[in-house]
Regions:
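Short acidic/histidine-rich active-site segments
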Residues: 238-239, 269-292
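Short catalytic helix/loop segments, enriched in acidic residues and glycine
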Residues: 18-37, 297-299
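Structural preference for beta-strand elements that scaffold enzyme active sites
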Residues: 2-5, 42, 89, 107-111, ...
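Mid-to-C-terminal alpha-helical segments outside catalytic/metal-binding sites
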Residues: 290-329
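A metal-dependent hydrolase metal-coordination microenvironment
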Residues: 29, 34-122, 141-143, 150-166, ...
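Conserved, mostly hydrophobic/aromatic
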Residues: 7, 35, 93, 132, ...
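Glycine-rich tight-turn/loop motif centered on a GG-T
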Residues: 59-67, 149-167, 175-178, 209-221, ...
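Histidine/acidic residue-rich metal-binding segments in metalloenzymes
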Residues: 120-130, 134, 152-178, 183-204, ...
């Protein structure tokens, strides 16, 4: 069955890899060859902005500005697509994706994880669009011009988007960019709900699970999931062990837990809210699905859990495709 995965961190990992590896074939979790083998319709490739000088050193990468980093990764992304144009092509919206599929090609969407690069200047948002970016995760795990992230501290969770952050959400809705609330504070999430409802646009939690099954602050509460569904949005099931297991320190990611989250999501807010956001190449631990070509293993588990073929199709690609169609230009 074909699928759309709304989040992987593969591009970041290439900053650490040798020049002999590419998006066509590599030693990590996501490449075009295995995407094709698994039946991928589309993959969202995130440009994750490393959080500080220490993280650059830990990753073995020479520090650079956010825009130097974005330029470098986006150039590699587009170069690898051009070099493999028989297999895959860039998509900036639903029509692009469907045209690619009709031509026998997979689609690649470009995203940015951490909206700090906007730096209180809307021109930077527009510049990212010109580079092909169609989804932005508003925050990562630190404060930025848009707002605050998820944390255990109640005061931070209760902090709203900044006034500029609210303008960013409005502008993204206008431009045809998908707003992503994974990593955002709880209060910031509700601001996005209000703005997107007003604008008649869906949004996503590209790689988040349910807090009621795995009590990590990165996950959504039941009420958040329902509100997300009401806007026509969806959440991508994250394969990280600590976001699936009741024990947030767990180190084993189990397909049965993914199915439990999907089932509860369906029962709480309807099947239309459930999608995929693997977070491959951005997560650690013992992963039952450790490669993009193994994603269909989840569909087999959903069938065992009682999901119909139509429901599995919605999780695999239909729900994400609907949001792409409704949000992206």
């Amino acid at each position: 069955m074909k699928f759309i995965d709304m989040h992987c961190d593969t591009l970041m990992r290439f900053m650490q890899k040798s020049d002999t590896e590419s998006l066509l074939s590599n030693s990590i979790s996501v490449d075009f060859t295995r995407m094709k083998k698994g039946g991928a319709l589309a993959q969202f490739f995130a440009m994750f902005l490393l959080p500080g000088e220490g993280s650059w050193k830990q990753a073995g990468i020479a520090p650079m500005t956010d825009w130097e980093y974005i330029n470098r990764l986006s150039e590699q992304f587009h170069d690898d697509l051009a070099a493999n144009s028989d297999l895959i092509a860039f998509a900036g919206n639903y029509d692009d994706m469907i045209a690619n599929e009709k031509a026998g090609k997979m689609s690649a969407f470009l995203t940015i994880e951490d909206g700090r690069f906007i730096e209180n200047d809307m021109a930077n948002l527009e510049k990212s669009y010109e580079k092909g970016v169609r989804l932005i995760t508003l925050t990562w795990n630190g404060i930025n011009c848009n707002g605050l992230p998820h944390v255990i501290d109640p005061a931070t969770q209760a902090t709203n988007l900044t006034p500029f952050g609210k303008e960013v959400v409005n502008r993204m809705n206008e431009m045809g960019m998908l707003v992503d609330v994974s990593h955002l504070s709880d209060a910031g999430f509700w601001d996005v709900v209000d703005i997107c409802k007003k604008n008649g646009k869906p949004f996503v939690a590209s790689h988040s699970n349910l807090r009621s099954l795995s009590p990590h602050t990165r996950n959504l509460t039941d009420e958040m999931l329902k509100a997300l569904a009401e806007t026509g949005g969806c959440t991508g099931i994250n394969f990280a062990p600590g976001f699936l297991d009741p024990d947030i320190t767990a180190q084993k990611s189990k397909i049965t837990d993914m199915a439990k989250h999907a089932l509860k999501m369906k029962n709480l807010a309807g099947i239309e809210v459930v999608a995929l956001g693997s977070d491959l190449d951005g997560i650690t631990g013992e992963l039952e699905i450790d490669s993009v070509d193994k994603i269909p293993m989840l569909f087999d588990e959903l069938k065992k859990a009682g999901f119909t073929e139509s429901e599995i199709e919605k999780v695999a690609y239909t729900n994400a495709a609907r949001v792409i169609k409704d949000a992206m230009k």
